[in-house]
Amino acid sequence: MLFGFFRTLFRILFRIRLTGDTQSLQGERVLITPNHVSFIDGILLALFLPGRPVFAVYSSISQKWFMRWLAPLVDLVPLDPTKPMMIKHLVRLIEQGRPVVIFPEGRISVTGSLMKIYDGAGFVAAKSKATVVPLRIEGAELTYFSRLKGLVKQRLFPQITLHILPPTTLPMPDAPRARDRRKIAGEMLHQIMMEARMAVRPRETLYEALLSAQDRYGARKNCVEDINFTPDTYRKLLTKTLFVGRILEKYSQKGEKIGLMLPNAGISAAVIFGAVSRGRIPAMMNYTAGVKGLTSAITAAEIKTVFTSRQFLDKGKLWHLPEQLKQVRWVFLEDLKAEVTTADKLWIFAHLLVPHLAQVKQQPEDAAMILFTSGSEGHPKGVVHSHKSILANVEQIKTIADFTAKDRFMSALPLFHSFGLTVGLFTPLFTGAEVFLYPSPLHYRVVPELVYDRNCTVLFGTSTFLGHYARFANPYDFFRVRYVVAGAEKLQDSTREIWQDKFGLRILEGYGVTECAPVVSINVPMAARPGTVGRILPGMDARLLAVPGIEEGGRLQLKGPNVMNGYLRVENPGVLEAPTAENAAGEVETGWYDTGDIVRFDEHGFVQIQGRAKRFAKIAGEMVSLEMVEQLANALSPEKMHATAIKSDASKGEALVLFTTDSELKREQLLHYAREHGVPELAVPRDIRYLKQLPVLGSGKPDFVALKSMVEEEEHHDA
């Protein structure tokens, strides 16, 4: 009677929805593992789950006054991680056929993300051989019963959904010690919980995700700031988005690919969202690629119109680009204000009231954006990402990291770089954090000063950029920073050490590829291991293909919701080439992406990058990683830049060429260091060439195509 009353009351107030297969909750041995976001989670499950499950509640919670009130109505078992007998009691209950509910986090989330997962819950699942049913509670975190005050826009009665996910099992880990089995079981359950979050992510477009963020965090919440030092709220960003979207229609057609050549600025975010809301596909133009690289991009994506800014071209000294690239129409943002009519203003005002109507009909799987590869190994390729793939990568990042609305991101990597776009713009916007967009990562003195001045808590960049920031920064500049993330190139030991010694900060290294939107794996405070790039993100499948000559590891292939729709190539303009990869049996499979990177997984699933398959030399029958050669040079000369190329060799097949900006670096030094540290002598180049400055790409990485050309030109000349 009382249960029926409260069930009806909650259903009316919170519009409770129960999704999934409830039959999976009624098996012989069932362990239900929900996330924990509010004080009413237990009440919700007691009222709406079928049957009468036993609730395992941590002792610190079970002794509260409201739990005493619930005790006569539901079956409670106090859980104390320090008392093994309680774990055994839960195992017996499951073996007797009672469904048991355990909140594996053991406490209510204070970040909105998953908290630490206690090993005990995983051990119970493995020991009892239970069917594990993950359950996601969505919406309760927005109530006043959550602990997210100040992080989300709380409300009295938000809609709450209980998602029952497909059941799974958790086998007892094969480890010699009970402590290890318990720990591994906890990690396995953590993975199940993360996969559950990914499984219930909303089906949205980028524009809809912006509206959802405004609704979740509040229209008046600051979200974007640039060097004008006037932050935009979600409401103001939406207004600019509607304005730009309306005007872009006059210069393009629905479904057309339009070039964007813009700096890191608030208006750039508005142009991106404005374009996608009206069904245009922004192609992010890499202005550092030069006329040749941009010509390839324009051809591959069949771009007819490029939107840019006069002020940007002035400050960047880039006027030679529109002067030489006459095959496209150039439209300047400064001219758009003059295009606004009274009808446009009325349209914008009306759609501020009903912003969902501003989006033209489209699906999350439709093409949303085009990014271009760096061209480090040939012509730049257009990488077509859908709304789904970009938002999946953002959700993967949110699942493993605890970014909140109190964070402030410093984003200096350009938006044409996939790392800068996803991690530097979309991730903060969709987590309620504020982002400061700065137009250049090369201002090594300015960036640390802005991190200090704007109270930034999250900084990311390449190893090269982070190393320069550390050298020029005051030891107090990063006093508020809690996340420093390195990607796009291998993190150098010298960079890691200076950040630890000077600032007391641990750099978290990650790995990504443009084709995966881009983050594939990343170390986070909850799961970090030096010398690795973290674990593969939840929601992704990974496999290794054996490579002749490589004893440990193999070529990494990936499949998941964040993988691109396909390539656009210069050789076949405008035609989408879906991702495919050849499996171990030699069969071509669609949906898989071959990274071309040689990696290995350690015993805990952390990824170690060995190098690119194309960046190995075969010397006297042995495979030598070019990255190993560069690491050798970096160890002796960390202040300089080094890059390795390959030349043909009559006696050994191939030989190494080391390009360096250190005029004092000699083979004898490299050989001595290699012998001391167990590096094979084959990895020590005989041909060392000094360059005052290495050719580099816009991302800061060496231009290996240019270096290869230099080697080939010399070989041709010698011939």
Swiss-Prot record:
Q: Where in this protein does the record put region AMP-binding?
A: 233-646
List the PROSITE patterns hit by this protein, alphabetically: AMP_BINDING
List membrane-spanning regions.
Answer: 258-277, 409-433
Which keywords does UniProt give here? Acyltransferase, ATP-binding, Cell inner membrane, Cell membrane, Ligase, Membrane, Multifunctional enzyme, Nucleotide-binding, Transferase, Transmembrane, Transmembrane helix
Name the reaction it catalyses. Answer: a 2-acyl-sn-glycero-3-phosphoethanolamine + a fatty acyl-[ACP] = a 1,2-diacyl-sn-glycero-3-phosphoethanolamine + holo-[ACP]; a long-chain fatty acid + holo-[ACP] + ATP = a long-chain fatty acyl-[ACP] + AMP + diphosphate
Q: Spell out the InterPro entries in the cross-references.
A: Aas, AMP-bd_C_sf, AMP-binding_CS, AMP-dep_synth/lig_dom, ANL_N_sf, Plipid/glycerol_acylTrfase
Compartment list = Cell inner membrane
- Topology in the membrane? Multi-pass membrane protein
What residue ranges carry the coiled-coil annotation? none
Query: What molecular function does GO assign, one term?
Result: medium-chain fatty acid-CoA ligase activity
Q: Where is this region: Acyltransferase?
A: 15-138
**Per the UniProt record, which EC number(s) apply here?**
2.3.1.40, 6.2.1.20
Give a single Pfam family match.
Answer: AMP-binding
Main location as per UniProt: membrane
Residues at the active site? H36
Name the family the entry cites: In the N-terminal section; belongs to the 2-acyl-GPE acetyltransferase family.
- PANTHER family recorded: ACYL-COA SYNTHETASE, ACYL-COA SYNTHETASE FAMILY MEMBER 3
| Its job | Plays a role in lysophospholipid acylation. Transfers fatty acids to the 1-position via an enzyme-bound acyl-ACP intermediate in the presence of ATP and magnesium. Its physiological function is to regenerate phosphatidylethanolamine from 2-acyl-glycero-3-phosphoethanolamine (2-acyl-GPE) formed by transacylation reactions or degradation by phospholipase A1.
Protein name (record)? Bifunctional protein Aas
Tell me what organism the protein belongs to.
Enterobacter sp. (strain 638)
Q: Write the lineage as a comma-separated list.
A: Bacteria, Pseudomonadati, Pseudomonadota, Gammaproteobacteria, Enterobacterales
Gene that this sequence comes from: aas
